[in-house]
Amino acid sequence: ESLSKLIGIPWKVHGRDYNGVDCGGLVILASRVLYGLTVPDMWEYGAENNLQVAREAVNDLSLFSDPIEGVEDGAIAVMKFKDVFHYGLVVKGKILTISGEKQKSLMRRIPTHYKVTFYRIRKEAE
Protein backbone atom coordinates (compact mmCIF):
# COMPACT_ATOMS: atom_id res chain seq x y z
CA GLU A 1 0.00 0.00 0.00
CA SER A 2 2.79 2.46 0.82
CA LEU A 3 4.45 1.85 -2.55
CA SER A 4 1.19 2.42 -4.42
CA LYS A 5 0.89 5.85 -2.76
CA LEU A 6 4.38 6.75 -3.99
CA ILE A 7 3.59 5.96 -7.61
CA GLY A 8 1.93 8.76 -9.56
CA ILE A 9 3.15 11.69 -7.46
CA PRO A 10 3.52 14.74 -9.73
CA TRP A 11 6.81 16.52 -10.41
CA LYS A 12 7.50 19.62 -8.33
CA VAL A 13 10.87 21.35 -8.01
CA HIS A 14 11.98 21.11 -4.35
CA GLY A 15 8.87 19.00 -3.60
CA ARG A 16 9.26 16.71 -0.60
CA ASP A 17 5.78 15.25 -0.03
CA TYR A 18 2.85 13.55 -1.72
CA ASN A 19 1.77 16.83 -3.35
CA GLY A 20 4.87 16.80 -5.55
CA VAL A 21 8.52 15.73 -5.63
CA ASP A 22 11.68 16.11 -7.66
CA CYS A 23 14.04 13.13 -7.90
CA GLY A 24 15.78 13.99 -4.61
CA GLY A 25 12.48 14.57 -2.85
CA LEU A 26 11.21 11.19 -4.01
CA VAL A 27 14.32 9.48 -2.59
CA ILE A 28 13.83 11.29 0.73
CA LEU A 29 10.10 10.51 0.94
CA ALA A 30 10.29 6.89 -0.24
CA SER A 31 13.27 6.04 2.00
CA ARG A 32 11.28 7.20 5.02
CA VAL A 33 7.92 5.70 4.03
CA LEU A 34 9.14 2.31 2.76
CA TYR A 35 12.24 1.64 4.87
CA GLY A 36 12.06 3.98 7.87
CA LEU A 37 15.35 5.60 6.84
CA THR A 38 16.15 9.29 6.99
CA VAL A 39 18.01 10.74 4.02
CA PRO A 40 19.36 14.28 4.46
CA ASP A 41 18.08 16.82 1.96
CA MET A 42 21.05 17.60 -0.26
CA TRP A 43 19.16 18.47 -3.42
CA GLU A 44 18.62 22.22 -3.09
CA TYR A 45 18.97 23.12 -6.72
CA GLY A 46 17.41 25.43 -9.24
CA ALA A 47 17.53 25.65 -13.00
CA GLU A 48 20.76 27.66 -12.99
CA ASN A 49 22.84 25.26 -10.89
CA ASN A 50 21.36 21.76 -11.27
CA LEU A 51 24.55 20.15 -12.57
CA GLN A 52 26.79 21.62 -9.86
CA VAL A 53 24.43 20.64 -7.03
CA ALA A 54 23.93 17.14 -8.45
CA ARG A 55 27.70 16.61 -8.51
CA GLU A 56 28.03 17.87 -4.94
CA ALA A 57 25.19 15.59 -3.85
CA VAL A 58 27.06 12.56 -5.22
CA ASN A 59 30.04 13.52 -3.03
CA ASP A 60 27.76 14.11 -0.03
CA LEU A 61 26.34 10.57 -0.27
CA SER A 62 29.46 9.37 1.58
CA LEU A 63 28.25 11.25 4.68
CA PHE A 64 25.37 8.82 5.24
CA SER A 65 25.71 5.91 2.80
CA ASP A 66 28.21 3.49 1.32
CA PRO A 67 28.65 2.38 -2.29
CA ILE A 68 27.63 -1.24 -2.86
CA GLU A 69 28.03 -3.72 -5.68
CA GLY A 70 24.79 -4.80 -7.25
CA VAL A 71 21.17 -4.04 -6.56
CA GLU A 72 19.65 -3.94 -3.08
CA ASP A 73 16.20 -2.79 -2.03
CA GLY A 74 16.36 0.51 -0.18
CA ALA A 75 19.56 1.62 -1.90
CA ILE A 76 19.87 4.99 -3.57
CA ALA A 77 20.50 4.64 -7.29
CA VAL A 78 22.65 7.34 -8.86
CA MET A 79 22.28 7.31 -12.62
CA LYS A 80 24.82 9.20 -14.72
CA PHE A 81 24.46 9.86 -18.41
CA LYS A 82 26.79 12.34 -20.07
CA ASP A 83 27.13 15.14 -17.48
CA VAL A 84 23.72 14.61 -15.91
CA PHE A 85 23.09 12.90 -12.57
CA HIS A 86 19.69 11.51 -11.65
CA TYR A 87 18.52 9.83 -8.44
CA GLY A 88 16.09 7.07 -7.60
CA LEU A 89 15.45 4.44 -4.93
CA VAL A 90 15.65 0.69 -5.46
CA VAL A 91 12.32 -0.94 -4.59
CA LYS A 92 11.53 -4.58 -5.40
CA GLY A 93 14.51 -4.78 -7.74
CA LYS A 94 13.44 -1.77 -9.80
CA ILE A 95 14.03 1.97 -9.50
CA LEU A 96 11.36 4.29 -8.14
CA THR A 97 12.06 7.57 -9.90
CA ILE A 98 10.65 10.74 -11.39
CA SER A 99 12.17 12.39 -14.43
CA GLY A 100 11.01 15.96 -14.67
CA GLU A 101 8.28 18.42 -15.45
CA LYS A 102 4.96 16.99 -16.58
CA GLN A 103 6.05 13.57 -15.31
CA LYS A 104 4.83 11.45 -12.41
CA SER A 105 6.77 9.07 -10.18
CA LEU A 106 6.98 5.52 -11.47
CA MET A 107 8.83 2.23 -11.26
CA ARG A 108 11.41 1.51 -13.97
CA ARG A 109 13.71 -1.34 -14.77
CA ILE A 110 17.29 -0.66 -13.82
CA PRO A 111 18.84 1.00 -16.88
CA THR A 112 21.67 -0.71 -18.72
CA HIS A 113 22.47 2.06 -21.20
CA TYR A 114 24.18 4.36 -18.69
CA LYS A 115 26.17 4.09 -15.47
CA VAL A 116 24.25 3.34 -12.28
CA THR A 117 25.91 3.31 -8.86
CA PHE A 118 24.09 2.08 -5.75
CA TYR A 119 24.49 3.37 -2.19
CA ARG A 120 23.26 1.66 0.98
CA ILE A 121 21.91 4.15 3.50
CA ARG A 122 23.54 3.68 6.90
CA LYS A 123 21.06 3.08 9.71
CA GLU A 124 22.98 5.52 11.93
CA ALA A 125 22.29 8.24 9.33
CA GLU A 126 18.89 8.53 10.97
Task: Cite the ranges covered by each PLM segment.
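Residues in well-ordered beta-strands of folded domains
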Residues: 12, 78, 96, 119-120
